[in-house]
């Protein structure tokens, strides 16, 4: 895992934040910001913070998919902010269909984006020892990697992701595009498998949520990842689909993140 830590690290940890817009609504403050993830990547993000109360937590809320999915989690971020957390939703993009080298590069950039987002949280007032990460689907994939390489995290939530997911989805994508599945591709997907990363000892508490009716990531894959994970960990399973977006699911995540 030392190689993974080097791959997902930067020599410098300073971050500069630019605010392009700000407004207040329903007891929270909304900001549109940009920051640098590395020397060549400028990231757009939404930051939601409490209005008129002390910040008790900092949380990154990472969307799934390969494009900007912040809109699916804005209400959840607002609810956590109303509970005392400052929440950042950074945009990440990954390209699983563009070959191994490009995919590895975009995964690295996405992980560096999430790590820089933690720096932004601290810069904007989050207590450094309270940092949390929540990731849905592909965002959960990033959360699994961060479990192994980001020591600042106090709590991690991974929902709707599991062991073997990257291998299954990337190979299916390759075949659907008419490309051959090579041994190099299989080895690369195996190296990035989530179960490998969550098995590393860490201080962060880990919550894994999964829906039994998830057609994208079978519940068995989520359970396999949970079984591989190091302690401390918690498993919550629901009679639901891939989204895990009901109020109960959101409340369980918020309770885990916001608990003192």
Spans of features found by a protein language model:
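Short substrate-entry loop that stabilizes the transition state in hydrolases
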Residues: 53-56, 61-96
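Alpha/beta-hydrolase active-site loop
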Residues: 101-125
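Hydrolase active-site cap/lid region
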Residues: 140-187, 245
């Amino acid at each position: 895992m030392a190689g993974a830590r080097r791959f997902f690290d930067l020599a410098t940890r300073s971050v500069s934040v630019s605010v392009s817009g700000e407004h207040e609504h329903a007891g929270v403050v909304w900001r549109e910001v940009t920051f640098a993830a590395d020397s060549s990547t400028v990231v757009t993000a939404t930051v939601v913070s409490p209005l008129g109360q002390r910040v008790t937590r900092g949380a990154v809320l990472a969307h799934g998919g390969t494009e900007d999915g912040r809109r699916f989690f804005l209400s959840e971020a607002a609810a956590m902010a109303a509970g005392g957390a400052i929440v950042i939703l950074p945009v990440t993009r990954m390209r699983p269909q563009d070959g191994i080298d490009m995919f590895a590069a975009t995964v690295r950039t996405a992980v560096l984006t999430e790590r820089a987002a933690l720096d932004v949280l601290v810069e904007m007032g989050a207590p450094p020892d309270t940092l949390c990460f929540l990731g849905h689907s592909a965002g959960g994939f990033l959360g699994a990697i961060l479990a192994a390489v980001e020591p600042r995290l106090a709590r991690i939530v991974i929902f709707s992701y599991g062991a073997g997911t990257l291998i299954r989805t990337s190979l299916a994508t390759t075949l659907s595009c008419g490309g051959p599945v090579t041994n190099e591709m299989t080895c690369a997907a195996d190296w990035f498998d989530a179960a490998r990363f969550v098995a590393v000892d860490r201080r962060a508490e880990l919550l894994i949520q999964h829906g039994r009716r998830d057609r994208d990531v079978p519940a068995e894959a989520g359970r396999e990842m949970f079984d591989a994970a190091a302690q401390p960990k918690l498993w919550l399973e629901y009679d639901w689909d891939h989204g895990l977006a009901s109020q109960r699911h959101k409340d369980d995540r918020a309770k885990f993140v916001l608990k003192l």
